[in-house]
Amino acid sequence: MTHLLTIHTQVEGEITALAFGGAGILRYHGFVIFVPFTAPGDQIICRIIEIKKSFAVAELVKLKQPSSLRVQPPCPYFGKCGGCQLQHLNEQTQLNYKLTAITDTLKRIGHLKVPSVEMNTAQLNWAYRRHITLHLKSFNQSFQAGYIATDHFSLISIDTCPIFNNLHDPIISILQKFISTLPNPNQQDGRLTLLKNQNSQYILSFQFCSLNELNRILFQEALEKYPIFSGILVTSPKKQWIIGNPYSEQKIENLIFRFTPQAFIQNHPEQSLYIYKKICSLTIQLKSKKILDLYCGFGITSLLLASQGHFVTGIEYNSDAIRFAKENSKLNHLPHVEFLEGDVEKILPICLKSQKCVDLVIVNPPRIGLSKSVIKILMSALPEDMIYISCMPSTLARDLSILCEDLYEIHECTAYDMFPQTSHVETLVHLKKV
């Protein structure tokens, strides 16, 4: 039926469901049209902006009759900014969508038998993010900060972000004022990560292609002018400036972790703590003695498990993360842990050869999931149990379809609402050898 639709055609109808990614689904003569920022039950008019063989994408033109599932989004940039997809939906609808996204994806892509998925809901749905990364665009011989728009190209300049801070918190406005003073004669772009410290201050991490020496003084003056900044890290491929104290120390359970804004850390402190507690609880139940923690970052999970008396080996390719993991091990006086730097697919076989009795393997890969070679190595090693933590249901389903074909079964599956107001969700799966 694609011949019935052309670009800019307006279509009227009802949104019947949400697709993976959060867009509403409108069916037009059996043809699927995805309409972002709509809710099931909405009566709408939309305009076609993209046509593919099996579906089309449209933009909302008019909301004729709003769904009862709608709420008023508090963010002034919602619908333009590409960061949040679900602010217009009430909390229960968001949770239902995420549960459905996980179970449907595991069944459709993985062809898996999925036990009932438990959802760990977030108590904090706003101002929850530990850090944000803003894009810096050249603007009037200086810079402007913001998020990439829904067109995946334009910059939406912002002065607030309600999933990071309260709406009237001035921190982003202060940042915009500061970066507008930075000369940018080469008209380069960059990135800025803003990390909350536990002392109500912020750490800034700038990344540029090259550094303008004239700006070093301005960064130093910023710490004096804005006491809310505790430290600034400025990096390029060839240089790094460390101004003030760009290191964060955060307490998780009874341990102290030191890191910089460049390190990966889960963004929702409350929800990530539930995940760490779940992993610790499982390892006690399983009576695991030797544990491999793959993609271990700067060692939070590894060190929490080591504090329980488990022997843990963490593997991570990022050299800075491994350096902080080792520092955190010394900081917390934990001897039952070692950290190895390198690609998992290269280090893992060596590690398994030297540690022949690994009880449990924990994997927390990036969005792309596990490589085929890592899956092959794990299937050869056949640990009794695996814990797979994922923020991408599609790659989780792909990997589990291989692992669970003959060797493993899903023993437990828990979802964590780590990213309220967005379409993203974190999943923890406990796999047991058949």
Swiss-Prot record:
Belongs to the class I-like SAM-binding methyltransferase superfamily. RNA M5U methyltransferase family. The keyword S-adenosyl-L-methionine applies. GO terms for biological process: methylation; RNA processing. Gene3D superfamilies: 2.40.50.1070, Nucleic acid-binding proteins (2.40.50.140), Vaccinia Virus protein VP39 (3.40.50.150). This is Uncharacterized RNA methyltransferase pc0248. InterPro entries: MeTrfase_TrmA_AS, NA-bd_OB-fold, SAM-dependent_MTases_sf, TRAM_dom, U5_MeTrfase_fam. GO terms for molecular function: 4 iron, 4 sulfur cluster binding; metal ion binding; RNA methyltransferase activity. Its EC number is 2.1.1.-. Residues 4-62 form the TRAM domain. NCBIfam families: rumA. The active site is at 391 (nucleophile). Keywords: 4Fe-4S, Iron, Iron-sulfur, Metal-binding, Methyltransferase, S-adenosyl-L-methionine, Transferase. It is an enzyme of class 2 (transferase). The keyword S-adenosyl-L-methionine applies. S-adenosyl-L-methionine binds at residues 266, 295, 316, 364. [4Fe-4S] cluster binds at residues 75, 81, 84, 161.
